[in-house]
Amino acid sequence: MKMKTSNIIFSIVIVLLITVLMTGRSTIGSLLSGNVHFPEEYVNNVLTMEDGQRFTVFRRLMVDGNKEGQGTPAIFKVRFRFKNFNIGVNKRLSIIPAPFLIGMEGFLEKDWTINEATNEFQGIYQWSSTEAAEKYPNSFIFELMTKRAAPGTVTYEIMPNTDLSAYLSAISNK
């Protein structure tokens, strides 16, 4: 198992390096300019979703000044179960796509959440427009995530004209 884990982690690091090279200029520019933040607001808050499931926010990422393709904001939500590793390992590995997200046109924010009762992970993203949100399921990083998900567990939805801050405030149980 240790060899398998190290092979997977090595593969992920290679993919990360390729991704940074692909999105390098905008990612590095955002990082160096101080536009990338990991705010604590909502971290450890429990969110009660529309289907009644409860997810806890364990990480947030925000990018200022990434408003290309502006329109009305949209939320992209994805939910799935990982097929390998325990919750702790997957929480740590879940940061790997961050450099790619930072470089994506229209990406503004991601909240990582988990339902520990069902072992489901959920990502809640803010995009600058519905068009930007609609591109995400066709991205390399989304494809990588779905390959790590247990078969048949990936679901997603796009919520046009929705501001993530207002949405989180409405569903947060603190």
Summary of predicted features, one role per range:
Residues 4-108, 159-174:
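Short S/T/G/P-rich N-terminal loop/turn motif that feeds into the first structured element of a domain
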Residues 20, 74-80, 109-140:
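Short, well-ordered beta-strand segments in beta-rich or mixed alpha/beta enzyme
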Residues 68, 100, 113-114, 146-148:
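Generic marker of residues within folded, mature protein domains
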Residues 100, 104, 139-144:
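Conserved short hydrophobic interaction patches
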Residues 134, 145-146:
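Exported/periplasmic cell-wall-interacting domains
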Residues 146-160:
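Conserved short beta-strand edge segments in small beta-sheet-based binding/regulatory domains
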